[in-house]
Amino acid sequence: MAKNESTGFSFSDVEVAVLKNFASINPSMVISPTGLSVINTAKSVVSFYDFNKPYSFEEFGVYEVPEFLSVLGALDNPVVEVNEKYLIVKSGDQKTRYFTTAKDLLPKVPSVGAKFEKVECELDFTLTADKLAALFKMAPIIKADWLFLESDGKKIRLTVGKELNTSSNTFDVTIAADIKANELKSPIKVPLSDLKVLPGGYDVKISSAGISRWSSDVGPVYYIGVKAN
């Protein structure tokens, strides 16, 4: 789809995919001309995505992003025009009027990048797309609730399961190349319910202070809370 139109704009396929993904974190968000940001209701996940090029529209709020995406998907090559209280979504001689939501009624997303840079991270590694896909594929099969991370300082093991014990079903992958890791006295765990990241590879940094950063090779950055096991 074309990036900008004289009478409006069109989201790219990648931007639509990120919108759909962010809506799984929280369906309500403010859409900015420079990018997207979202925070979940528990405030344990904050995510950001910058557009390749800024748009020229005024930022607007959407209460139900999945519904908004369905409106876009129902039209061929939709073009969006932003008005003060509503959007016009057009395709040829067809159009939909879709009302926006006041920004002060939607979750405010805090800036966390600068704070994260000051946090000491015990784990710093690259998680390839195939390893992430394998973890995500197996997790629902064995009814896993957590992603556990263990390190002896030389390699990092990522395990999905309900618990790390001999009576629980688990699945793990090991990363030994290009890592920066301290030996962990106890595992760090991430709730799989919070790990709503797009498929792909990630540069991952994890701190026992309770936060992790997952930087995608396709653009989004996710800050996700972690816990000591």
Predicted regions and their residues:
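Short, well-ordered, aromatic-rich surface patches in folded extracellular/luminal domains
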Residues: 100-110, 115
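DNA polymerase processivity clamps
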Residues: 2-101, 118-229
